[in-house]
A protein has these predicted regions:
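Short, conserved catalytic or interaction motifs in soluble domains
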Residues: 8, 44, 76, 115, ...
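Residues forming the Rossmann-fold NAD(P)(H) cofactor-binding site
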Residues: 159
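Cytochrome P450 core scaffold surrounding the K-helix E-X-X-R motif
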Residues: 42-48
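N-terminal Rossmann NAD(P)H-binding glycine-rich loop of SDR-like oxidoreductase domains
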Residues: 154, 162
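NAD(P)H dinucleotide-binding glycine-rich loop of Rossmann-like/cofactor-binding domains
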Residues: 56, 80, 90-152
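Conserved S-adenosyl-L-methionine
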Residues: 164-167
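Glycine-rich beta-strand-centered segment in the early N-terminal region that forms part
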Residues: 21-39, 51-94
Length: 167
């Protein structure tokens, strides 16, 4: 399969599109055909090597942290998902791998996509949405009913807010 792979840290020249082996699901993994992937500041910080002291991946490494797609396989212990389900997910930091034709992710990091949300819109929700939730709820203590301003409302955070307000 094709994937965007980090060969060495630095600028864009350190990463390239190349053929790699398809991932193999672990018992709790979902195997997904990636239809769209989100691009975030963490992705280029990772490529630049700014996170290597924390994550320490073995290079070469498939980049990408969030995606949307269709389930094409499940591990033996998966209970909540089936082949054909439309899902979006945030890949665990130590695994990454969203910038590929297929990705594996633990079922705890996957959610079913709303039927009226397309893959492109859904791919931008997991990382930005979870980051916003953690910031608002855990760091700032925002409570239900309080108002907040969402700057850049067309991204993952705005999409989540729009979805929550529209039912």
């Amino acid at each position: 399969m094709r994937a965007y792979v980090l060969k060495h840290y630095g600028g864009p020249e350190g990463s390239l599109l190349m053929d790699v082996s398809a991932p193999t699901p672990r018992p709790r993994d979902i195997l997904v055909e990636v239809r769209a992937a989100g691009l975030n500041p963490v992705d280029f910080k990772f490529r630049q090597g700014k996170l290597r002291a924390i994550l320490r991946p073995k290079l070469p490494f498939v980049l990408g942290n969030e995606f949307a797609g269709e389930v094409i396989g499940v591990g033996d212990d998966v209970k909540q998902f089936r082949v054909g389900d439309r899902v979006f997910a945030r890949v665990a930091k130590e695994r990454a791998g969203a910038f590929a034709e297929q990705a594996c992710v633990d079922e705890d990091h996957v959610a079913h996509m709303p039927r009226d949300l397309d893959f492109t819109a859904a791919a931008g929700v997991p990382l930005a949405g979870l980051t916003a939730l953690q910031a608002l709820r855990d760091e700032l203590g925002v409570k239900p009913g309080q108002r907040v301003f969402i700057s850049g409302g067309a991204g993952g955070v705005g999409t989540l807010q729009f979805r929550s307000r529209s039912g």
